[in-house]
Regions:
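Interfacial juxtamembrane loops and adjacent helix segments
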Residues: 62-125, 276-339
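Signature aromatic-anchored transmembrane alpha helix within multi-pass, membrane-resident enzymes
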Residues: 20-25, 219-222, 251-260, 369-375, ...
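Hydrophobic, aromatic-rich transmembrane alpha-helices
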Residues: 348, 353-376, 431-434
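Membrane-interface transmembrane helices that cradle and orient dolichyl/undecaprenyl
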Residues: 181-197
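Short helix- or helix-capping micro-motifs
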Residues: 151-156, 183, 204, 208
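Transmembrane alpha-helix segments characteristic
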Residues: 26, 150-151, 361-365, 373-394, ...
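C-terminal luminal/periplasmic domains and tails of membrane-associated envelope-modifying transferases
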Residues: 7, 290, 294-301, 305, ...
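Transmembrane-helix motifs of polytopic, lipid-linked glycan transferases
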Residues: 122-142, 180-184, 369
């Protein structure tokens, strides 16, 4: 069955109404993000990213966080600079031992921690707004106004996107980067436009400067250009003329544009850093990742030629080493592994996606099969990259969250919308999408403001999330502030002992509580607040990172909670309060 093409006379007649509807939906999604982030404590990685953001934007050096590219942190950093934040204290020549650490920087700053993280998170919420709007506009081009509006509605209330739109991290930016790059490249292919190829290159460069996994976009864009070249050759042969090579010229233009954006981002972040200091930062980072000396030598050679390229190469090399050696302990449905699970992201997608979203995809797959929807370049551009991401995810040893698969959500949704509007009458397609979106909205509102801990009802909901997954899927440290408020409400702050996993500072939030120090601290009877992550894999993760004494302490805690602890309350879905009884003799 041939796909129906976009009819400008239908869709362009109401651009104001379309734009208003999409902007309102995107704004509603952002409102949910703002509402949950005002209550969320810093997640595990946020103090690191916030310190790095301030370093890049205010100090103009790049000693911290080489394992991530700088673009998102530059956005956060310039927002912090405008709000009056300071740069972290880092002496030159640089020494890791003397550098200010993330938690002291975050909680002993001119800005209160709530304001510091609120300002740093704001640019990520803006990226979420842009993702919703850009997805709606792209679908509108191919399927009309109604399809675009329903796409915006489904994305604006998708719980995983909402969760990570409120975190200083790179995952939401990767979702926007994948979608924008692929859609612009597909449009450039359709229209034979060098301008669109240049725009795709800018989007590609921004994606590469946002997250290292976006390097997977490079072969995808090259493949689209090859499709364009084959099409040009075929059309030129029919017409008896030489091919115009627009796709090849477009690919070269996109490559140049992406390089300018990528290395320009690094240049801004390290504008006050000398080449020797850049090389020193590269060596310190790669040694900390236990990279082979041969790898370090090659990256340092690149750094001597270009400090920007050297930092990018160091980040890629560090990720590669981590994937080979393991980045930590992974948890899946009761099992632990440092090597990862091939099925991890398939399970995570199944239990972390809303039932409404999954229903839309299932109906679209059924319609595509029974109506024999013919896949064109646009549909393949939207469907094959998610398949590629899932396949590459099977080989990774770093299984820490569905957040690494955020790019598949807008791509798969856009593909589903196109299939439904091509194969069904518009009212039937709209009914399917509206039903799925309303179901998803109900699921999201039911768990709000705990979107980070979302699990669908088929998996048992967030209360059963710990049986499936942990880490950034459930417990990333976001509920520490809520815990402090709960303890004060109960009148239990002074008698509570807190065993916490995350980026928050326990003495800041609960100054009268006792902080559990695993190495050597006894596990006494009383009221305990314990992070879910520590119960599932705290001892194993601590041992993996070279702290046997801490691992032994966490193992004692887990044993004590399992054998003589009674759950008396829960904070969000990531922290449980236990009444720990005396040990029977």
């Amino acid at each position: 069955m041939r796909g129906r093409h976009y009819n400008p006379s239908v869709s362009d007649a109401r651009p104001v109404r379309f734009g208003f509807a999409v902007l309102v939906l995107a704004a509603c999604g952002v409102a949910l993000v703002v509402d949950h982030t005002r209550l969320d404590s810093p997640t595990m990685d946020e103090p690191f990213h916030t310190l790095a953001a301030a370093e890049y934007a205010i100090a103009g050096t790049y000693y911290a966080n080489l394992e991530h590219p700088p673009l998102v942190k530059l956005f956060s950093g310039f927002a912090l600079r405008a709000a009056g934040a300071r740069a972290p204290k880092m002496d030159v020549p640089f020494s890791m031992a003397m550098a200010e650490q993330p938690r002291p920087f975050s909680f002993h700053s001119p800005l209160a921690p709530e304001k510091l993280f609120g300002v740093a998170r704001a640019p990520v919420a803006v990226l979420f707004f842009l993702l919703v709007v850009s997805a709606a506009c792209a679908v509108r081009v191919w399927a009309g106004d109604l399809a675009g509006i329903l796409t915006a509605a489904a994305l604006a209330f998708e719980p995983n996107l909402l969760a990570h739109a409120g975190v200083v991290h790179t995952d939401l930016a990767a979702a926007l980067g994948f979608f924008a790059t692929l859609v612009l490249a597909a449009r450039a292919l359709e229209r034979g436009s060098l301008g669109l190829w240049a725009a795709a290159g800018v989007a590609l460069g921004a994606s590469l400067a946002a997250k290292f996994s976006c390097v997977l976009l490079v072969p995808m864009v090259v493949l689209l250009a090859l499709v364009g070249l084959l099409r040009e050759r075929r059309e030129a042969a029919r017409a008896g003329r030489p091919p115009g090579l627009v796709a090849l010229r477009g690919l070269l233009l996109a490559g140049a544009a992406s390089a300018v954006v990528l290395f320009g981002s690094y240049a801004v972040a390290m504008r006050h850093m000398s080449r020797p200091e850049a090389a020193k930062a590269v060596r310190i980072f790669l040694v900390s990742r236990q990279a082979p000396e041969e790898t370090i030598g090659r990256v340092l050679a690149i750094s001597r030629l270009s400090k920007e390229a050297g930092h990018y190469a160091a980040g890629l090399a560090g990720i590669a080493v981590q994937n080979r050696t393991g980045g930590g302990v992974n948890y899946l449905h009761g099992r632990l592994s440092v090597d990862g699970f091939w099925e991890y992201f398939f399970v995570a997608f199944a239990v972390k996606s809303s039932l409404g979203f999954l229903a839309i995809l299932a109906v679209a797959c059924g319609v595509a099969a029974f109506r024999r929807v013919r896949p064109d370049v646009v549909l393949l551009t939207l469907v094959l990259p998610p398949a590629y991401l899932f396949l590459t995810g099977m080989a990774t040893s770093y299984n820490i969250g569905i957040r690494h698969m955020l790019p598949v959500y807008p791509l798969l949704l856009a593909a589903a919308v196109l299939v439904l509007f091509r194969a069904l009458p518009a009212r039937a397609a709209a009914a399917v999408l509206l039903a799925g979106t309303v179901l998803q909205l109900g699921e999201t509102l039911r768990v709000h403001p705990h979107e980070l801990s979302f699990f669908n009802e088929a998996a048992g909901g967030p209360a059963n999330g710990a049986a499936w997954l942990n880490d950034s899927n459930l417990d990333w440290g976001q509920d520490l502030g809520r815990l402090a408020r709960r303890l004060r409400e109960r009148g239990d702050e002074e008698r509570a002992t807190i065993a916490y996993f995350g980026g928050g500072d326990v003495p800041y939030y609960a100054p009268r509580a006792t902080v559990f120090v695993p190495a050597g601290a006894p596990v006494r009877p009383g009221l305990w607040a314990v992070s879910s992550f520590l119960m599932c894999c705290g001892p194993e993760a601590t041992a993996f990172h070279g702290d046997p004494a801490g691992a032994a302490g966490l193992f004692r805690l887990r044993q004590a909670v399992s054998t003589r602890g009674m759950a008396v309350d829960r904070v969000g879905y990531s922290i449980v309060l236990y009444d720990l009884k005396e040990q029977k003799r």
